[in-house]
Amino acid sequence: MGRGRVELKRIENKINRQVTFAKRRNGLLKKAYELSVLCDAEVALIIFSNRGKLYEFCSSSNMLKTLDRYQKCSYGSIEVNNKPAKELENSYREYLKLKGRYENLQRQQRNLLGEDLGPLNSKELEQLERQLDGSLKQVRSIKTQYMLDQLSDLQNKEQMLLETNRALAMKLDDMIGVRSHHMGGGGGWEGGEQNVTYAHHQAQSQGLYQPLECNPTLQMGYDNPVCSEQITATTQAQAQQGNGYIPGWML
């Protein structure tokens, strides 16, 4: 009679279970060896008993190399397929982060412009006030520095204009000195004659325009013989001093 069909279930008898494990383990190791030799295949077999004892077989010289090869073949494709998904997930997280930062900056800008201040509490309002004060101080400082720079430029331009004016004045004085020197050396007699004539006319003008010493209390329309005599005497004296000739209406 042949062997009956063995039911595949856990052997409850401990001794029978250990005997069956030893027989089948040796048969499995033998089959792995035969497969590697007959088919020139790289075979690795790892067995752990129920007590945790290790049994292994490897057709190559190093079990770790076979395990690395198995890991690359089994999980490498999964990592390659999951790489775009991971990159997409990371990109989406970065997008959410940048979006939140952008919305926060927009909210801060509106708050600086005095908008959307209702949701802010007292602490946030104080912080916003300090931020505005700092910005205002910085703007004033930059404005003051700009005005000081402009003032310095204007002072430099003023100094340059003063130096230019001083140089032109010195040049003008030199030109006047040279001209006076030439005139004094070539036309002495003509210059003296012009001076005498100018003095003569000046004396006449001063004599003609001397004030008349009349009584200021005299009224218009009343003849005063004393004042008339004084006017006549003064006019005759001035005419004699001027050219020695007395007009007929004065006689």
Swiss-Prot record:
BP-aspect Gene Ontology terms: cell differentiation; flower development; positive regulation of transcription by RNA polymerase II
Keyword annotations: Activator, Coiled coil, Developmental protein, Differentiation, DNA-binding, Flowering, Nucleus, Transcription, Transcription regulation
Tissue-specificity statement: Expressed mainly in carpels, and weakly in stamens.
Residue ranges of domain MADS-box in the record: 3-57
Classification via InterPro entries: MADS-box/MEF2_TF, MEF2-like_N, TF_Kbox, TF_MADSbox, TF_MADSbox_sf
Alphabetical list of Gene3D superfamilies matching this protein: Transcription factor, MADS-box
Keyword match Hydrolase: no
Major location category of this protein: nucleus
Coiled-coil blocks: 85-176
Entry-linked PROSITE patterns: K_BOX, MADS_BOX_1, MADS_BOX_2
UniProt keyword Nucleus present: yes
Subcellular location: Nucleus
GO molecular function: DNA-binding transcription factor activity; protein dimerization activity; RNA polymerase II transcription regulatory region sequence-specific DNA binding
Subunit structure: Heterodimer with AGAMOUS capable of binding to CArG-box sequences. Interacts with AGL16. Interacts with TT16/AGL32.
Cited function: Probable transcription factor. Functions with SEPALLATA2/AGL4 and SEPALLATA3/AGL9 to ensure proper development of petals, stamens and carpels, and to prevent the indeterminate growth of the flower meristem. Forms a heterodimer via the K-box domain with AGAMOUS, that could be involved in genes regulation during floral meristem development.
Protein name listed in UniProt: Developmental protein SEPALLATA 1
Organism of this sequence: Arabidopsis thaliana
